[in-house]
């Protein structure tokens, strides 16, 4: 072995042949194996995005096909969100106890199977039930894919990589809108559910056969050193030769705690950040789900065609894809809380401008895109921020509970849209009202930068 390589190896291994696995990940160049993990996790959140947004794109055609009033669609819009709350709240502690991979596999089976069932619904009652059950799988998949991938990213570019991975969620929502603009008129609303059902079931096979368990989870739980070595040898094989033991930094401080995952979330070290993350995510999802659920319908009310309404809804989601590279890069270099706060504030401003732009179709599309860039960029960065904030022992729970509690904001956003429409609020009035949750999210995450900025890893 060359002298330089031998000296580098000594930086990782102690006299007991114990290797700091996180230091290995941080210092090694990205391997093909890590890119494979990135692709699989990207596809998971991509199909999650398609299925999450499906109801918003289907709603106008469904209302016309079944002859129901738009105000009757509120329960259908909110049903999946209710399931997502349960899925997120249950899956986090489950993943921290049994592993990320098994939770991901089961979540894809659940939301794929019940999305297919939605395609065969014959009334609103059955559709509400199937969308609720779909939501349980959706709520479990996204935070656990984010957690798993973040644990394979080097600290120097973690925010950039995870934000780019997570933009698959926004891309899935956008592609769902673009596809539905021709798929639904050609083949009916059932076709989008069929697409959104088969895709995760096929992807589940990739998860089972190609996605590894989190090496950090295996180390902290004291499980299968041989398996950890096999995983890390596919990332930096020269660094694991002769190593008999692996560790990660925070286990020296946190391992053996009697608090449990919930005790850690609400310990003095994490409680302020936990509450502020929840408030921020809640307010962000009020904005996103009001627009995701009702923007196509609102556009139809202003005279837009079905195809145009679906296109503009997809354009809003596509904005999150465009912002991923910049916001991830900025979070790795500056205070990530303040970067996100700026994006939320910009989202509220652009929402107000969108409400004033109905008379100019070109400007309307441009400002819808800008609003999507701002709010989806901020929201897609929140799981990254949460994963950075919590240690391995409670990371899946921390990310998932932020997602789960935040989903109450999604339910509220979808519900309040139906209420405001039922009370004859105009397009302009509804869009202008969104400055309130935008400002609240910006303030909450800015305060976090002052009182709870520390990263766990």
Curated annotation (Swiss-Prot):
One of its GO terms (cellular component) is plasma membrane. Residues 56-72, 123-128, 190-191, 296-310, 360-363, 422-426 are periplasmic. Pfam families: MFS_1 (PF07690). Residues 1-34, 94-101, 150-168, 213-274, 332-338, 385-400, 448-457 are cytoplasmic. InterPro entries: MFS, MFS_AAHS, MFS_dom, MFS_trans_sf, Sugar_transporter_CS. The chain crosses the membrane at residues 35-55, 73-93, 102-122, 129-149, 169-189, 192-212, 275-295, 311-331, 339-359, 364-384, 401-421, 427-447. The keyword Cell membrane applies. It is a multi-pass membrane protein. Keywords: Cell inner membrane, Cell membrane, Membrane, Transmembrane, Transmembrane helix, Transport. Gene3D superfamilies: MFS general substrate transporter like domains. It is found in: Cell inner membrane. GO terms for molecular function: carboxylic acid transmembrane transporter activity. Belongs to the major facilitator superfamily. Aromatic acid:H(+) symporter (AAHS) (TC 2.A.1.15) family. Homotrimer. Uptake of 4-hydroxybenzoate (4-HB). Can also transport a variety of aromatic acids with hydroxyl substitutions at the 2-, 3- and 4-positions, such as salicylate, 2,4-dihydroxybenzoate, protocatechuate, 3-hydroxybenzoate, vanillate and gentisate. This is 4-hydroxybenzoate transporter PcaK. It comes from Acinetobacter baylyi (strain ATCC 33305 / BD413 / ADP1). The gene is pcaK.
């Amino acid at each position: 072995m060359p002298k330089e390589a031998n000296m580098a190896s000594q930086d990782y291994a102690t006299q007991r042949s114990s290797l700091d696995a996180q230091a290995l990940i941080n210092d090694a160049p990205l391997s093909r194996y890590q890119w494979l993990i990135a692709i699989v996790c990207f596809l998971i959140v991509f199909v999650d995005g398609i299925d999450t947004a499906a109801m918003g794109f289907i709603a106008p055609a469904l209302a016309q096909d079944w002859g129901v009033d738009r105000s009757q669609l509120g329960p259908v819009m909110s049903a999946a969100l209710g399931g997502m709350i349960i899925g997120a709240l249950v899956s986090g502690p489950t993943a921290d106890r049994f592993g990320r991979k098994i939770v991901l596999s089961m979540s894809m089976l659940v939301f794929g199977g019940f999305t297919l069932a939605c395609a065969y619904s014959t009334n609103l009652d059955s559709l509400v039930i199937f969308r609720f059950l779909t939501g349980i799988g959706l709520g479990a998949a996204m935070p656990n894919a984010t957690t798993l991938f973040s644990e394979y990213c080097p600290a120097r570019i973690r925010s950039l990589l995870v934000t780019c991975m997570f933009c698959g969620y926004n891309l899935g929502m956008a592609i769902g809108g673009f596809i539905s603009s021709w798929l639904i008129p050609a083949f009916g609303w059932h076709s989008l559910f069929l697409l959104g059902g088969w895709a995760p079931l096929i992807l589940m096979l990739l998860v089972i056969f190609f996605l590894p368990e989190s090496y950090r989870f295996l180390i902290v739980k004291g499980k299968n050193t041989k398996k950890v070595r096999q995983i890390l040898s596919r990332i930096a094989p020269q660094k694991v030769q002769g190593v008999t033991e692996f560790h990660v930094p925070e286990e020296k401080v946190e391992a053996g705690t009697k608090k449990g995952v919930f005790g850690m979330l609400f310990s003095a070290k994490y409680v302020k950040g936990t509450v502020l993350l929840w408030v921020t995510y809640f307010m962000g999802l009020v904005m996103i789900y009001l627009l995701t659920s009702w923007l196509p319908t609102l556009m139809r009310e202003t005279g837009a065609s079905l195809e145009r309404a679906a296109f503009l809804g997809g354009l809003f989601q596509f904005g999150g894809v465009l912002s991923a590279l910049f916001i991830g890069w900025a979070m790795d270099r500056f205070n990530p809380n303040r970067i996100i706060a700026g994006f939320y504030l910009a989202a509220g401003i652009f929402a107000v401008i969108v409400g004033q732009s109905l008379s100019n179709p070109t400007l309307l599309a441009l400002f819808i895109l800008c609003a999507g860039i701002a709010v989806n960029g901020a929201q897609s960065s929140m799981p990254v921020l949460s994963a950075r904030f919590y240690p391995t022992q409670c990371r899946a729970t921390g990310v998932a509970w932020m997602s789960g509690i935040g989903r109450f904001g999604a339910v509220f956003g979808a519900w309040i849209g139906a209420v405001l429409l039922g009370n004859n609020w105009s397009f302009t009035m509804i869009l202008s009202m969104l400055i309130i949750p935008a400002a609240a999210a910006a303030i909450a995450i800015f305060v976090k930068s002052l009182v709870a900025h520390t990263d766990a890893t």
